[in-house]
Curated annotation (Swiss-Prot):
Cellular component GO terms held in the UniProt record: cytosol
Family listed: Belongs to the CTP synthase family.
Function, in words: Catalyzes the ATP-dependent amination of UTP to CTP with either L-glutamine or ammonia as the source of nitrogen. Regulates intracellular CTP levels through interactions with the four ribonucleotide triphosphates.
Binding site for CTP: 13, 148-150, 188-193, 224
Class in the EC hierarchy, top level: ligase
Pathway note: Pyrimidine metabolism; CTP biosynthesis via de novo pathway; CTP from UDP: step 2/2
Location of the region described as Amidoligase domain in the Swiss-Prot/TrEMBL record: 1-267
Organism the protein comes from: Picosynechococcus sp. (strain ATCC 27264 / PCC 7002 / PR-6)
Record gene name: pyrG
Catalysed transformations (reactions): UTP + L-glutamine + ATP + H2O = CTP + L-glutamate + ADP + phosphate + 2 H(+); L-glutamine + H2O = L-glutamate + NH4(+); UTP + NH4(+) + ATP = CTP + ADP + phosphate + 2 H(+)
Lineage start: Bacteria, Bacillati, Cyanobacteriota, Cyanophyceae, Oscillatoriophycideae
Domain of life: Bacteria
EC number(s) on file: 6.3.4.2
GO molecular function: ATP binding; CTP synthase activity; glutaminase activity; identical protein binding; metal ion binding
Name of this chain's protein: CTP synthase
Residues annotated as binding UTP: 13, 188-193, 224
Amino acid sequence: MAKFIFVTGGVVSSIGKGIVAASLGRLLKSRDYSVSILKLDPYINVDPGTMSPFQHGEVFVTEDGAETDLDLGHYERFTDTSMSRLNSVTTGSIYQAVINKERRGDYQGGTVQVIPHITNEIKERIFRVAENTNPDFVITEIGGTVGDIESLPFLEAIRQFRKEAGRDNVLYMHVTLIPWISSAGEMKTKPTQHSVKELRSIGIQPDVLVCRCDRPLPQGQREKISEFCNVPEEQVITSQDASSIYEVPLMLEREGLAEQTLKLLRMEPRQPNLEQWQNLVERMKRPNRHMDIAIVGKYVQLNDAYLSVVESLGHAAIANDMDIKLHWVNAEDIEKHGASMYLADMAGIVVPGGFGLRGVDGKVAAIEYARLNQIPFLGLCLGMQSSVIEWARNVAKLEDAHSAEFNPEAKNPVINLLPEQRDVVDLGGTMRLGLYPCRLTPDTLTYQLYGQEVIYERHRHRYEFNNAYRSLFLETGYQVSGTSPDGRLVEIIEYADHPFFIATQFHPEFQSRPNHPHPLFFGFIQAAGNHKSQPISDELDNQSTEMSISLS
């Protein structure tokens, strides 16, 4: 039977529960245990697919086409394991399932209540992950903060879980904040004490406390937390701020988190194999060269809207021994002031995905600037569609070319709605979603980077390249370097007379891993480094250099 670990958070939101859960998953996997990580989100949306990126951040897409919380990206990157729609649960999806059962008569006329019907549905979702993937451990992160009214059904469900699964099969881990009060000159444990008190009032006594702090936790404070929170001292774990999230598993390993977890769940203690992860972190801290990369987007006010793009650039930077500084460029600013003001000093330009007309002309201008000035360019989803519009207008001389998404009356709709999308009415969960095969064209840079003919990538879109214009594009020098296996859908384009000009309809950022950077990001960073980079001085080299992945 699987062991179940529940990760809750207290005092403040965004405390790092997802990174703690992902790091624990990495530590257990390094001991040859299998792990699946589940996120319970308390919002009433069925999934985050239709939520604003400014509110929610990135929507992470799984292989089976689920639109999920960005924390699932952390889970996949840290454990190098693909998650599924089973690993993402929201209050909205729980209530939707319960109401559907009530409408079918499954409850046989009974009064449907939070307890037991909602809590039973929550527990069923957790057990389903264990049954479908058969892992040694199921780690469940509960979104929100203890004390939030939205989280109460989830907390009640996991309280009941220990009785049903058995005391030795369930562990409660609470992530909390230990703030430094500068006026007092000390760290304060009272917020943690109150957070644990709140959790205990619900009926959950945490087995392990993970204390987030910006400096080492003094022994006296650790003893105080142990005494007042009724947690053994060795199970009070410090999680100090790090320059990169990829340092956190190593820090928690030194603190004994995995060792205590295995002891409490009566599992065999094993020696971890973290050599590859340690080498990754060491290499990240010792880059040879520095360069500047621009991300031209429409949601740049919230960097988390492009989290997987940032992480993928970081993975590729490590593999190329590069330190990169990201420059966030609002596409609308380019529309007002021109591209050269923001992009002249860049080693590479990334144009990521998005929806809607706002900022598209700025993206098109950025892509034209990259093409004309031989600056390495990588376009993703809307970034590819924008590159098609740019080529159509400026090279193929179709001056009124546009996407049917933005101008349904366009005379030259070089981007058009997928045929299967024409009768779709609902927005949520109806796009082309999930993992699809793509056949690469030999003798292209894309083929060279992947090193294989058929690849599999994750999609999230309704619109595609309009094949009515394919011949014209090929005649003017555009290369189609990847299509669906039947050749019907254009998935990758590139421009051969350029150091690196590749754009994809899919989202390669969802497939990148710290120890396995995505080939397209690797090639992009390599080309950008060749275009414009500077050696790092000995003085800087002796410092802890902050890579792009630490931005998240």
